[in-house]
Amino acid sequence: MGAPLAAALGALHYLALFLQLGGATRPAGHAPWDNHVSGHALFTETPHDMTARTGEDVEMACSFRGSGSPSYSLEIQWWYLRSHRDWTDKQTWASNQLKASQQEDSGKDATKISVVKVVGSNISHKLRLSRVKPTDEGTYECRVIDFSDGGRGVPRVLCLLIPLPAPPRAPRPRGQPPGEEPGRGPTLLFLIILPGTGSGTPREAEPHQPHAGGCPARQS
């Protein structure tokens, strides 16, 4: 009875954290975000919440339709932010994240892990993360640069990865081969989406070593 109760309490703890983060990032009295960013621009595909066990492969999809006509260049950037602790600080998000400057507001703990650029009005890019592990914990961000507006606005979707601790190891049943061990605990991907503005310098980036998620978004 002790192990199942501990696992249930752990799951409730992370569910409470997810609800707290969702409440902190949505102003009171405001309707949920929609997919539209500005004009006809919108996200046509965003990452979904998902669960995965340690060692599994996961992927997060991000698709965007630009507002430019005729076609202009679009760019998708995937970023990895090593820490998610500031997510619980509502004032931090309101003052820092939603008022991004014209420069890349990457921060010292952010790493650009993937870049795709196309000439056209639609772009799509899936971030594939192999053999997820607890050290993959952090925030994954999909930024879109729409050059039809001069690259002034950068709509974004943010995905928070929270690995759950592994459950207590159960005794090996009689007759089970010594090499077999119980599986690791699940990894939860919670999705939180915020609007934002900013700009990025297009360039290729080396993939991030940790291998890592629909909610709507709009640009303020």
From Swiss-Prot:
Residues 41-158 form the Ig-like domain. GO terms for cellular component: cytoplasm; extracellular region. Disulfide bonds join C62-C142. Residues 165-220 are annotated as: Disordered. GO terms for biological process: negative regulation of neuron apoptotic process. InterPro entries: Ig-like_dom, Ig-like_dom_sf, Ig-like_fold, Ig_sub, Ig_V-set, IgSF_V-set/TM_domain. Keywords: Disulfide bond, Immunoglobulin domain, Signal. Residues 1-24 form the signal peptide. SUPFAM superfamilies: Immunoglobulin. Residues 165-180 have a biased composition (Pro residues). This is V-set and transmembrane domain-containing protein 2-like protein. It comes from Mus musculus (Mouse).
